[in-house]
Amino acid sequence: MQAKHQRLILGIIALAAVIAAGFLALVAFKKQAAYFFTPTDAVKAHLPANRNIRLGGMVERGSLIREKDGVTIHFRVTDGYQKIAVSYRGIVPDLFREGSGVVADGHFDPSGSFTAETILAKHDERYMPPVTQQQAAATQTTLQEK
């Protein structure tokens, strides 16, 4: 076989290997991607009970109810069109409040309500942890005094 043909075959094999590796990486990434359903998407999808999903949206103002045990809360997640009642038992993140963004990991009960096992509070790009806010305020005060 000529050297030209050997290089061509080697190039084809290398190209096939790169395509196969890319395909495998894409399949693996798709399985690991963490998408969430908005309330509208969840209602349209008619998701089966006890299937774990992520539900994302805004905590509806006026919907947050804390039970006397101190760890159980009930609230509604909305995307502006649909609302879904959510129950959660556990400690909520500091940023969790009415009107803020939330992603809840959990499942729908046979009754249609959503039981969250984990709650993630979303924040905007201007968020600063409380310690950083205190440091920034102290720096601002120091600069104003000078």
UniProtKB/Swiss-Prot annotation:
Membrane topology: Single-pass type II membrane protein
Coiled coil: none
Binding of heme, residues: H123, Y127
Gene Ontology terms describing biological process: cytochrome complex assembly
Compartments, record wording: Cell inner membrane
Pfam families documented for this protein: CcmE
GO cellular component: plasma membrane
GO-annotated molecular function: heme binding; metal ion binding
Main location as per UniProt: membrane
Superkingdom: Bacteria
Side Cytoplasmic, residues: 1-7
Key words, A-Z: Cell inner membrane, Cell membrane, Cytochrome c-type biogenesis, Heme, Iron, Membrane, Metal-binding, Signal-anchor, Transmembrane, Transmembrane helix
Residues in the Periplasmic compartment per record: 29-146
Stored HAMAP family: CcmE (MF_01959)
Purpose: Heme chaperone required for the biogenesis of c-type cytochromes. Transiently binds heme delivered by CcmC and transfers the heme to apo-cytochromes in a process facilitated by CcmF and CcmH.
UniProt name for this protein: Cytochrome c-type biogenesis protein CcmE
Organism: Zymomonas mobilis subsp. mobilis (strain ATCC 31821 / ZM4 / CP4)
